[in-house]
Amino acid sequence: MSSLVRPINLGKINHSQSTVKDYILLMKPRVMSLVIFTGFVGMWLAPYSVHPFIAGIAVVCIALGAGSAGAINMWYDRDIDSLMKRTQKRPIVRGVIESDEALSFGLITGFFAVFFMALCVNLLASFLLLFTIFYYICIYTIWLKRRSIQNIVIGGVSGALPPVIGYAAVSNTISLESIILFLIIFIWTPPHSWALALFCNDDYKNCKVPMMPAVKGTLYTKKQILIYSILLFIVSLMPFFIGMNNFIYLIISGILGVVFLYYAGSLFYDTPDNKQAKRFFAYSIFYLFFIFLLLYSTNTISTIS
């Protein structure tokens, strides 16, 4: 099951309608906000010191890198975005930003993000940022998204790298701690995305994007969500057992994980309106945010100074 980019007529571009808000929307601000937060937590957990100004530059570069990838993703996916209810109000589809402008904006933003990360922070963080942008655009968006049922699983590497970038920005290294942060997001991504696919199944079928519910069916998808949720529960406790976080983290993250498992199990009793899938999707966002807030607030190692 696959689809290629199809030429579409987005109508006449009215440049006078373009606003700063449209360019912010082009960068996928909801995704970018989570990227910024997880990247910052990665910096905070690194057992080294860094000047707050340098830390600020690193956060801005991570944000711009995420925005760059989001803009280029919207440029490439403009054909299927026009067919999906969830994405029909994106700037390119609405005709307020021209597709070529979106591509140029994404490329320029990405260049400056990587350049200033290398110039002001360190080369490792810059390389990881460049790799993340490349992976999200080339591996996930262009190659996997329309061709593989494992698009979200393999493509999730890019979304899981921001805390590793943040950690490297402070420490100039990759450690077990940053790998665990990576694993938490990497394992969280499939159940989160498949829950969305459950209640947007018709859209994905219409666009011929091989999301798991559209290819394997809803029951198989729900089983996979439960499996990944169990793995996530296990991995989410690891920060305590390697000494990253204290006992409070273990207790609260354990409770959050049990609730996550409850919502995953409730999918098997979902109604035709996908009420449980929507609840699980909403909770999964809260879960990841709160887990990283816990990682930030209950850490037992050095912080930015």
From Swiss-Prot:
UniProt keyword Membrane present: yes
Uppermost EC category: transferase
GO MF assignments: protoheme IX farnesyltransferase activity
One GO cellular component term noted in the UniProt record for this chain: plasma membrane
Subcellular location per the Swiss-Prot or TrEMBL entry: Cell inner membrane
Catalytic reactions of this protein: heme b + (2E,6E)-farnesyl diphosphate + H2O = Fe(II)-heme o + diphosphate
Record pathway: Porphyrin-containing compound metabolism; heme O biosynthesis; heme O from protoheme: step 1/1
Topology relative to the membrane: Multi-pass membrane protein
Residue ranges of the TM segments: 31-51, 52-72, 96-118, 123-145, 151-171, 179-199, 225-245, 247-267, 281-301
Keyword Transmembrane among UniProt keywords: yes
Primary localization: membrane
Pfam families: UbiA (PF01040)
InterPro entries tied to this protein: Protohaem_IX_farnesylTrfase, UbiA_prenyltransferase, UbiA_prenylTrfase_CS, UbiA_sf
Keyword line: Cell inner membrane, Cell membrane, Heme biosynthesis, Membrane, Transferase, Transmembrane, Transmembrane helix
Annotated family: Belongs to the UbiA prenyltransferase family. Protoheme IX farnesyltransferase subfamily.
Miscellaneous remark of the record: Carbon 2 of the heme B porphyrin ring is defined according to the Fischer nomenclature.
Role of this protein: Converts heme B (protoheme IX) to heme O by substitution of the vinyl group on carbon 2 of heme B porphyrin ring with a hydroxyethyl farnesyl side group.
Protein name (record): Protoheme IX farnesyltransferase
Lineage of producing organism: Bacteria, Pseudomonadati, Pseudomonadota, Alphaproteobacteria, Rickettsiales
